[in-house]
A protein has these predicted regions:
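Metallo-beta-lactamase
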Residues: 95-156, 163
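Conserved beta-strand hairpin/beta-sheet module of binuclear metal-dependent hydrolase folds
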Residues: 9-59, 156-171, 188
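Cap/insert and terminal regions of metallo-dependent hydrolase folds
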Residues: 175-257
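Hydrophobic packing residues within well-ordered alpha-helices of enzyme cores
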Residues: 56, 82-85, 112-115, 179, ...
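Adenine-nucleotide cofactor-binding loop residues
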Residues: 49, 151, 174
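Ala/Thr-enriched low-complexity intrinsically disordered regions
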Residues: 3-4
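Active-site metal-binding motif and surrounding structural segment of the metallo-beta-lactamase
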Residues: 51-101
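Active-site neighborhood of phospho(di)ester-bond hydrolases with catalytic His/Asp-centered motifs
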Residues: 45-49, 67-73, 77, 81, ...
Length: 257
């Protein structure tokens, strides 16, 4: 079961815990981007890069409690802890993975089966429900979940959760006007903000781009994540505020919203 901090599982609105707000190069300060989502008695993970099992352990969260994981894309900094997590669940309860769902973009089945083929009986006999979602929507807990391609890779997707509150997770993406339309009027937007304005990298956003994205999308609150060390500076909030006029949050790992 969850610890006292997470003992009440019925929430009026989704509760979000930042498991990782950085990148694979962030060192001990920030783990790669990942989030714990809690809503209406359900618990899910959104992305599972390296170090996320450690974060769950720090929070004393029973590995069997989450029922779902949402994957944005297949780069290792967003999904490498998934199979260790499935092994942990199997060792705790060898039938538990049959009650677990993995949602992700087109290509999820191939990615999963390729990795599972190297693991043997423990995984192949206790397979979770692997579900590809693209240009359609699903239901999780009391949330309608929609996805949209980001262009970061051929398969990468962003997620939009619609319950009592609309919440948008960009995953990895560059500045994308079509994605802004998909994110429009979310109360909370969680955007990647990888590199400084003076060193832009294709497929990622700078503070100026993330701030502009949030302003055009009309977010009431902006949470930035996926910050490389060179962009994780004291000036980051000022740079974002030059474009975005709403409530700005630069989180620390394990912050709760």
């Amino acid at each position: 079961m969850l610890t006292t901090r997470f003992s009440i599982l019925i929430f009026k609105m989704m509760k979000i815990t930042v498991l990782g707000s950085g990148t694979i190069l962030s060192g001990p300060v920030r783990k790669p981007s990942a989030f714990l989502l809690e809503s209406a008695g359900h618990v899910a993970l959104l992305d599972m890069g390296p170090g996320i099992l450690y974060q769950l352990s720090v929070l004393n969260i029973d590995f069997l409690v989450p029922d779902t994981v949402f994957i944005t894309h297949f780069h290792l900094d967003h999904c490498s802890d998934l199979f260790p997590y499935l092994m942990s669940r199997y060792l705790l309860d060898n039938g538990s993975n049959k009650r677990f769902k993995i949602f992700g973009p087109v290509g999820l089945h191939h990615w999963y089966e390729t990795n599972a083929s190297l693991q043997g009986k423990w995984l192949n006999d206790c397979k979770p429900d692997v579900i590809e979602i693209f240009n359609n929507n699903i239901q999780w807990a009391d949330q309608k979940v929609l996805v949209y391609p980001t262009g970061h890779t051929n398969q990468s997707i962003a997620y939009r959760f619609e319950g009592q509150k609309k919440i948008f997770f960009s995953g990895d993406t560059g500045f994308n006007e079509e994605l802004i339309s998909f994110a429009l009027n979310a109360e909370l937007g969680v955007l990647e903000c990888s590199h400084p304005d003076e060193k832009p990298v294709a497929g990622h956003m700078t503070p100026k781009e993330a701030g502009r994205f949030a302003q055009l999308a009309g977010f009431k609150e902006l949470v930035v994540c996926h910050m490389y060390p060179e962009n994780d500076t004291k000036e980051l909030s000022q740079k974002l505020a030059m474009e975005y006029q709403g409530k700005l949050i630069i989180p620390e790992d394990l912050d709760v919203f």
